[in-house]
């Protein structure tokens, strides 16, 4: 949008006596700051323009200015581009390409698809089921999809590798209906819509969910906003694979079908500049502008197409508007003075919606009748002819022209803004109505009218027999329309959507790769973040999987000690490095390259999560298994982008997610918004996330080795690993002899038994950075209180919980069968004394295993907000330091009747555990963020 600045100083010093009060307006982009090398010529041009304006009026002046801008662009004159154009089609009629298909045939089976989609949702509302669905979205977008399916979307058997199509979630009924005509789905399956487990014939998920329909859906697009973001990063990753020589993706296109209401989601628009910056001409957004969201108009007082045009064009996208169908061409051609275009420009979306909820007479009076010139344009047209003036998104030729132009455009991503009617063809109770999104069934008269519009050969008797169960329609596999439909898909490389479920396994490195991590750090203090980075550094050297590892970093590489990777792996940039880096002379210079391996996303966790998803699903989308390692401040992972990680799980992404600088007390000084004491809990809610909270480097080595085997071995699992790692350095021990690796991976093993027997016994369970405090607590218990404490390392509270829950579920369903014993129960079965759990997480994390811990169980944690202070002070405040653990153990012994409660009270007073100022500096407190 143009910004105007009034320069009063210039007005006051005007040199024109006849216009002393004239105010000079300076617009952005106008060359007021450039030297005028020929003032006389400039004055002549301006005078000519003034004369034109006076003689021919603003419309003619505007036309000539636009033509000049057009010619300047053709001649490659660098001038600011317009961000908004008239409310008409971008592609003029005379430049529309020939439509290559048989439009009559395609329209016939498009009508059948419309019918079956609506009937599927309608039948899902039958008595006793009532699971609903959305009818109107696909009704508005059927043409947008069908032009793509018939002429553009390439399947996986295509020589170029196939396209990636993100389908709008609410349009899923239409995709199922097409698959039914293709012979991929049965009527029984259609009747199982939204009844995935209860329907005997097999059910269909509500929306595109690959995890629920793994050989069909490829990309999840709900919740809304995730589709556009993930499509951008899928397109960028396709270039990444090509530029690094891993796969030729030059003939693969990414299509994202979106809704205009969806574009209000921050994720929908917030990353479109990435696509422009990366010149992703392999990406096309198709936005179905039916002008309505769930409750009402998207922009009742405005114009969403114009808004989106300005937004995308300003961000550097190629914009194609498909506003009006072919029936408008004659009227626009006859609009010699621009009255019709002016009417189109000035009518708000709320009125356009209302027009289509009425009839032709209403449109004549309330649209064309607002200007005598436009009223005269349609004077010879009947009300029905006016009513039949289609919107562009329902016109095969207009949509085809836009898609072809998008495919041919180079150097920019393209967005197609297609105007449609929500509930199109469904009748007066649906079309353009505010409630249409929530309407899930049709009345008998609506069914009959819909049948007539779609010309489906279904009789009144069939509809009246049971209005809840009107029949689906399929003409049979030998019908010419079905043969045509299938031939088009064969020519384009197979069915879409379709998902590859198997991929080649990787040759994984042996255990020797992890040797260094298992030796310990000696006297050197090393944080688990550094140990993790070192592990992957070793893996990057492996000739088989090294090139397939993709580090994903949201602008924190230096914090995590990964800046040494910049010069060796390099940062991926399609344009290479066109500047001289300020540190180019240094060994650890910031190096960008078109063949770089690192995806450095800037301060952008949302985009990083989308990159993780694209990389982590490459085994399916490209048959090229890639290994993402996405590392971030743990507070800004599941808390900030949990929805994206949930979608990654739905898409069955594999890889490593690393929550660095984890814990509530470890990140000294950073404070409330950075101190993470709950991401493990959030991660535990994601069924695909395998969570670990390792304390030692050798644990990390085993966990990563296990993760690679589970995700990339001979029988890969559709999971991803979430490791919480810390920035607090402490001495890393060597791997103990006879380490029970199986127990470590299950989530619990005995790390250090009490060195000698004492009067009383206890068990301390610790994870992550709490381990040094637990070990110190065991020493204090032995020296000060004559208590022998075994120290256990809990590598995964979450995995212990899941095992326990699974066993309980089996026990519930099969009470007469042995259900097994949870690992935590069997491990602690013979352990003496109370069990005290401590971590740098809120207590709800260790509380996950309470049902299966035998005996007295006490949990300590960091509940509440974090704050800025030293580590000892924070741990004393939350009572997770060694002294607090000692008191908790003594309280547990008192609860069991082993000692008097006064002993615990004595310890609490002695250690002053309620006094933050009394917190000592432990040997673990050697470093800062």
UniProtKB/Swiss-Prot annotation:
Pfam families: PDH_E1_M (PF17831), Transketolase_C_1 (PF22613), Transketolase_N (PF00456). There is a cross-link at residue 375 (Isoglutamyl lysine isopeptide (Lys-Gln) (interchain with Q-Cter in protein Pup)). The keyword Calcium does not apply. It is an enzyme of class 1 (oxidoreductase). The keyword Ubl conjugation applies. One of its GO terms (molecular function) is magnesium ion binding. It comes from the Bacteria. It catalyses: N(6)-[(R)-lipoyl]-L-lysyl-[protein] + pyruvate + H(+) = N(6)-[(R)-S(8)-acetyldihydrolipoyl]-L-lysyl-[protein] + CO2. Its cofactor is Mg(2+); thiamine diphosphate. Its EC number is 1.2.4.1. Keywords: Isopeptide bond, Magnesium, Oxidoreductase, Pyruvate, Thiamine pyrophosphate, Ubl conjugation. Component of the pyruvate dehydrogenase (PDH) complex, that catalyzes the overall conversion of pyruvate to acetyl-CoA and CO(2). AceE has reductase activity with pyruvate but does not react with 2-oxoglutarate. Homodimer. Part of the PDH complex, consisting of multiple copies of AceE (E1), DlaT (E2) and Lpd (E3). This is Pyruvate dehydrogenase E1 component. It comes from Mycolicibacterium smegmatis (strain ATCC 700084 / mc(2)155) (Mycobacterium smegmatis). The gene is aceE.
């Amino acid at each position: 949008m143009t910004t105007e600045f009034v320069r009063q100083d210039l007005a006051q010093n005007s040199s024109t006596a006849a216009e002393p009060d004239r105010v000079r307006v300076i617009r952005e982009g106008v060359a007021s700051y450039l030297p005028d090398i020929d003032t006389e010529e400039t004055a002549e041009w301006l005078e000519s323009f003034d004369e034109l304006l006076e003689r021919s009026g603003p419309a003619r002046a505007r036309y000539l200015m636009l033509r000049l801008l057009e010619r300047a662009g053709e001649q490659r004159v660098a001038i600011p581009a317009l961000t908004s154009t008239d409310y008409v089609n971008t592609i003029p009629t005379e430049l529309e390409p020939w439509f290559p298909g048989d439009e009559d045939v395609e329209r016939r089976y498009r009508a059948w698809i419309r019918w079956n989609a609506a009937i599927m949702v309608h039948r899902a509302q039958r008595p006793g089921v009532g699971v609903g669905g959305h009818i109107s979205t696909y009704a508005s977008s059927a043409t947008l999809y069908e032009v793509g399916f018939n002429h553009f979307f390439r399947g996986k058997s295509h020589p170029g590798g196939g396209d990636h199509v993100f389908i709008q979630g609410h349009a899923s009924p239409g995709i199922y209906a097409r698959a039914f005509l293709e012979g991929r789905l049965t009527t029984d399956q259609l009747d199982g819509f939204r009844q995935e487990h209860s329907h005997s014939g097999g059910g269909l998920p509500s929306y595109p969910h690959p995890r629920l329909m793994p050989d069909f859906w490829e990309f999840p697009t709900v919740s809304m906003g995730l589709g556009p973001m993930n499509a951008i990063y899928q397109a960028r990753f396709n270039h990444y694979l090509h530029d690094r020589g891993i796969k030729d993706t030059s003939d693969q296109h990414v299509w994202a079908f979106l809704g205009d209401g969806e574009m209000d989601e921050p994720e929908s628009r917030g990353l479109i500049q990435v696509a422009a910056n990366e010149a992703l001409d392999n990406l096309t957004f198709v936005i179905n502008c039916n002008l309505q969201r769930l409750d009402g108009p998207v922009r009742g007082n405005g114009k969403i197409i114009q808004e989106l045009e300005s937004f995308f064009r300003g961000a550097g996208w190629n914009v194609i508007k498909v506003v009006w169908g072919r029936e408008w061409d004659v009227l626009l051609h006859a609009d010699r003075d621009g009255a019709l275009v002016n009417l189109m420009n000035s009518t708000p979306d709320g009125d356009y919606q209302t027009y289509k909820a009425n009839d032709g007479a209403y449109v004549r009076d309330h649209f064309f009748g607002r200007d005598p010139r436009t009223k005269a344009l349609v004077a010879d047209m009947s009300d029905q002819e006016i009513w039949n003036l289609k919107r562009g998104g329902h016109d095969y030729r207009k949509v085809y022209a836009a898609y072809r132009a998008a495919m041919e455009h180079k150097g920019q991503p393209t967005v197609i803004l297609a105007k449609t009617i929500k509930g199109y063809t469904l009748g007066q109770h649906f079309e353009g109505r505010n409630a249409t999104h929530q309407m899930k069934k049709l009345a008998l008269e609506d069914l009959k009218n819909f049948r007539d519009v779609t010309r489906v050969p279904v009789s009144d008797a069939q509809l009246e027999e049971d209005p809840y169960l009107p029949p689906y329609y399929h003409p049979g596999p030998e019908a010419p329309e079905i043969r045509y439909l299938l031939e088009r898909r064969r020519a384009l490389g197979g069915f879409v959507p379709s998902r590859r479920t198997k991929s080649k396994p990787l040759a994984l490195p042996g255990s020797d790769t992890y040797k260094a991590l298992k030796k310990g750090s000696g006297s050197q203090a090393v944080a688990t973040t550094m140990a993790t980075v070192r592990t992957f550094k070793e893996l990057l050297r492996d000739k088989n999987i090294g090139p397939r590892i993709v580090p994903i970093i949201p602008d924190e590489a230096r914090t995590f000690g990964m800046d040494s990777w910049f010069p060796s792996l390099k940062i991926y940039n399609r344009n290479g490095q066109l500047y001289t880096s300020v540190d180019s002379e240094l060994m650890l210079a910031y190096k960008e390259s078109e063949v770089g391996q690192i995806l450095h996303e800037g301060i952008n966790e949302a985009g990083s999560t989308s990159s993780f998803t694209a990389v982590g699903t490459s085994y399916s989308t490209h048959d090229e298994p890639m290994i993402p390692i996405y590392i971030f401040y743990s507070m800004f992972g599941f808390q900030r982008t949990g929805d994206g990680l949930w979608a990654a799980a739905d898409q069955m992404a594999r890889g490593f997610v690393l929550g660095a600088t984890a814990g509530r007390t470890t990140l000294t000084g950073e404070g409330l918004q950075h101190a993470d004491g709950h991401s493990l809990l959030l991660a535990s809610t994601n069924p695909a996330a395998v969570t670990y909270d390792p304390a030692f480097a050798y644990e990390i080595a085993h966990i990563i080795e296990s993760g690679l085997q589970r995700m990339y071995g001979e029988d890969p699992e559709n999971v991803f690993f979430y490791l919480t790692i810390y920035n607090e350095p402490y001495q890393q021990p060597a791997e103990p002899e006879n380490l029970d690796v199986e127990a470590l991976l299950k989530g619990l093993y005995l790390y250090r038994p009490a060195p000698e027997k004492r009067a009383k016994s206890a068990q301390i369970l610790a994870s992550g950075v709490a381990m040094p405090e637990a070990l110190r607590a065991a020493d204090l218990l032995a020296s000060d209180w004559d208590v022998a404490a075994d120290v256990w390392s809990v590598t995964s509270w979450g995995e212990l919980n899941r095992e326990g829950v699974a066993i309980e579920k089996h026990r519930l369903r099969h009470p007469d069968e042995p259900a097994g014993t949870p690992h935590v129960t069997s491990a602690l079965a013979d352990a003496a004394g109370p069990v005290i759990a401590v971590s740098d997480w809120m207590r709800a994390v260790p509380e996950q295993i309470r049902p299966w811990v035998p005996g007295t169980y006490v949990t300590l944690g960091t509940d509440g907000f974090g704050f800025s202070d030293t580590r000892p002070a924070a741990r004393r405040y939350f009572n997770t330091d060694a002294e607090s653990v000692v008191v908790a153990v003594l309280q547990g012994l008192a609860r069991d009747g082993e000692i008097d409660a006064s002993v615990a009270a004595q310890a609490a007073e002695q250690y002053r555990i309620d006094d933050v100022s009394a917190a000592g500096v432990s040997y673990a407190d050697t470093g800062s963020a």
